[in-house]
Amino acid sequence: MKTLSASACLAIWERGAGHHPARQALHLLNAAWPEVGPDMLAQLSLGQRNLLLLRLREQLFGSQIESVVGCPGCGQQVELTLDVRDIGGQPDQEFLEPKAPYFFSQGDYQIHFRLPNSLDLLAIGPDQEATIARNALLARCLVLAQQGDQTISSDQLPLEIEAQLIDQMAQADPQADIELAITCPFCARAWQVGFDVIHYLWRELTAWAYRFLGDVHTLASEYGWAEGDILALSPWRRQAYLAIIRGT
């Protein structure tokens, strides 16, 4: 994994601002794993993608994740603190390859499928109604479906086979849809909440970018330096100049 500089992070943020979250994720992965290649990264399963994003998040902002969620029982705000390594492991080089298609059979149905990836999310788009998006995703990920010796399409699958397909996908790629188990310290209500890795990471990147650009503005205003000169400074030197300006 490549270490990303401040200027690289700014470029990624600017390039991905306002884009589909799947596109934002690919911008980050392409910058951090250039040796893998954009085509290969785009074909990684969503669980593989999320684990790489968590690893990158640890490089950029540290391993500790903090958030606040509202308790559905008492309405109190519950603070969460967790480690990225508690959510997923550290992927090795073999992990950086798309997974082969999977197979299961039930009754006289034989189902071959692959796992959803970033290209699927980009093709479906962010604004589709949930049922339409799910059906489109299943259609894209269904490699081959047969009833006996007859090939059938995804919309011909019985509901129980469709449910089995969704369950098989979830079991094969558990980090694709990360759920955090939470217990409220105020009322002891237990529930689960989804953790959207790219949403959280991009929000952090945006907050960092605004803080960093504020520092650039401060240094440029005080010393008349160009943005490129400020970005070329080491983080320690930038902070030293900022401390001088602020008198700390």
Model-derived features: where do they sit?
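Long C-terminal interaction/binding lobes of large macromolecular proteins
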Residues: M1-T248
